[in-house]
């Protein structure tokens, strides 16, 4: 590569140098250079022993989002390689990614393809979004593929119209029996009954919007939708040291 680079004209070399300097500018920071100088995480071990790895970045500053993208890319590549070449295609310890603020973090290239092949390797993700509009903005053409590759869909509430419509359609329709009675008065009074079956959305988009905040809707592949109370997180006992770390 260096030989190819050096074969260019002086103007081309200067342009490459400027582009490279701009790309690597953040690595001039001593703290970032120190963080990325050596590998201390042993990423493949996540698929071999129980481990919790937290990646915390400020939600109001995207300057270092690329680090999380690098971390995700390295994790998926190394875990897939470990599963395929050491354990016959499936990791001994399941690895679950909780991808909070999914829309605000840089993602690996071809994430939709990664999502479609991870299950057999004992890798899974929870994609957490404010609404489906965020997913459509990130993956204009592949968003339906991403939703389709998720076996579970949990709706906690929201105020975005396209999400309400999607959830309403996902719920499907209910069958309604309708009885209509008619009676005419007079000399030859008649009495009639009309019976018909019709369909109605289980919840209309407006009813989805007005869903009681205590409830959530859960969709599991191959099962009927479930409406249930959300779990009260205040019931979980958190020890004082853990509370302080949070």
Where do the PLM segments sit?
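P-loop NTPase motor core of the ASCE superfamily
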Residues: 51, 113-116, 134-235, 239, ...
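P-loop NTPase motor domains
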Residues: 1-123, 138, 206-227, 236-239, ...
């Amino acid at each position: 590569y260096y030989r190819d680079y050096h074969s260019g004209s002086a103007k081309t070399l200067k342009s490459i140098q400027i582009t490279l300097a701009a790309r690597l500018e953040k690595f001039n920071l001593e703290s970032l250079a120190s963080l990325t100088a050596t590998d201390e995480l042993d990423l493949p071990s996540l698929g071999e022993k129980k481990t919790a790895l937290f990646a915390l970045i400020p939600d109001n500053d995207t300057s270092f989002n690329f680090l999380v993208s690098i971390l995700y890319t390295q994790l998926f590549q190394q875990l897939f390689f470990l599963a395929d070449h050491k354990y016959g295609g499936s990791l001994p310890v399941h690895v679950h990614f909780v991808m909070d603020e999914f829309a605000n973090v840089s993602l690996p290239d071809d994430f939709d393809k990664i999502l479609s092949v991870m299950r057999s390797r004992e890798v899974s993700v929870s994609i957490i979004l404010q609404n489906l509009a965020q997913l459509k903005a990130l993956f204009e053409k592949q968003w339906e593929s991403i939703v389709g590759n998720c076996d579970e869909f949990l709706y906690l509430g929201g105020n975005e119209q396209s999400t309400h419509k999607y959830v309403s359609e996902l719920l499907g329709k209910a069958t309604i029996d309708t009885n209509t009675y008619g009676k005419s008065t007079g000399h030859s009074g008649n009495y009639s009954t009309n019976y018909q079956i019709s369909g109605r959305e289980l919840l209309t988009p407006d009813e989805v919007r007005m869903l009681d905040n205590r409830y959530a809707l859960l969709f599991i592949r191959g099962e009927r939708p479930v409406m249930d109370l959300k779990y009260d997180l205040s019931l979980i006992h958190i020890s004082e040291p853990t509370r302080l770390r949070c």
